[in-house]
């Protein structure tokens, strides 16, 4: 997926075409490119989406809207991992709930799987199976075998609780949108395999604070610095600990390599306060 981004206040600056998700090794370059256009702030939604190329059709609603680049990148990563069922659930629920803002769309990625979306009414057993999996968060094969899936589907369809959308008839099943993303601290999420995660927070926050910004190692200096700013780390003394972050990154990478050589699998640091 590609996004064409510009500066709404200064359209004469031109635009930049950004790949989404942003490849790790291109992150710093992308931020520099956006900086030449006077956009790409850590927190501000200052990137006007001129065009979305590829990706889910629902994302076209972001065109002509101002977004934050890191939020857009995070949303793209979340959606990139969706299968076709989750894609239908996300898009149908976005239409049903009328969600347009980036915070809402990100939060929707964490709960849209609870909805049931019917795109083909010809296979009642498949509908019944999908509905049971959606409302239960999964089902054992034995449970599915003991259930009349056709009757389950018919009850759902005859309930008339569905909402017709361009992506199918959606049943929300009582889904409630929760604020997993608070608008500042992007929730931890392993987009790629074999990554290390380090949570950073300001020294002024309590030990059990939920105000954590996650860094996925190895990452660029730009990602670390922007992560620190997103986490609210602005005190000069705290910024000096940037060297400690780099040292921790090296230590964690060595630990990962050691564990992999022993076949121990993935290693993750749950939280590290800066």
Regions found by a protein language model. Give the residues of each.
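Elongated, non-catalytic scaffold/linker segments and compositionally distinctive motifs
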Residues: 150-158
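Short, surface-exposed polybasic-aromatic patches that bind anionic ligands, especially phosphate groups
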Residues: 164
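Mixed-charge (acidic/basic) macromolecular-recognition segments
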Residues: 28-147, 151, 171-195, 207-274
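Short, extreme N-terminal segment that most often corresponds to the first beta-strand
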Residues: 1-26, 190-221
